[in-house]
Swiss-Prot record:
It is an enzyme of class 5 (isomerase). It catalyses: 3-phenylpyruvate = enol-phenylpyruvate; L-dopachrome = 5,6-dihydroxyindole-2-carboxylate. It is found in: Secreted; Cytoplasm. Its EC number is 5.3.2.1, 5.3.3.12. It comes from the Eukaryota. Keywords: Cytokine, Cytoplasm, Immunity, Inflammatory response, Innate immunity, Isomerase, Secreted. GO terms for biological process: inflammatory response; innate immune response. Disulfide bonds: none annotated. This is Macrophage migration inhibitory factor. SUPFAM superfamilies: Tautomerase/MIF.
Length: 115
């Protein structure tokens, strides 16, 4: 059930159509979770600043049931910052990623929860 969200001030027209699918596949590989459970949400055209500058930036969140913590987060950060730089042209030093390890009982899907 990993959910990855990117809020960015990059305009929608500059977001490649392929990015959703590529993020899904790369997150599936990195987390070891099936692609069919991974959700990606890109929110472009946001009024944002980072360090007082409105140059391209991104504020991101990765939620997952497990697979969050320590070295895993460093691996995800490298992967995601590289992809954001490649596809959205946002420098890695203008990206924050917050990680959330969610209890399975607190995630609803398909009429129930994952617990």
């Amino acid at each position: 059930m990993p959910m990855f969200t990117i809020h960015t001030n990059v305009c929608k027209d500059a977001v490649p159509d392929s990015l959703l699918g590529e993020l899904t596949q790369q997150l599936a590989k990195a987390t070891g979770k099936p692609a069919q459970y991974i959700a990606v949400h890109i929110v472009p055209d946001q009024m944002m600043s980072f360090g007082g500058s409105t140059d391209p930036c991104a504020l991101c969140s990765l939620y997952s049931i497990g697979k969050i913590g320590g070295q895993q987060n460093k691996t995800y950060t490298k992967l995601l910052c590289d992809m954001i730089a490649k596809h959205l042209h946002v420098s890695a030093d203008r990206v924050y990623i917050n990680y959330f390890d969610i209890n399975a009982a607190n995630v609803g899907w398909n009429g129930s929860t994952f617990a």
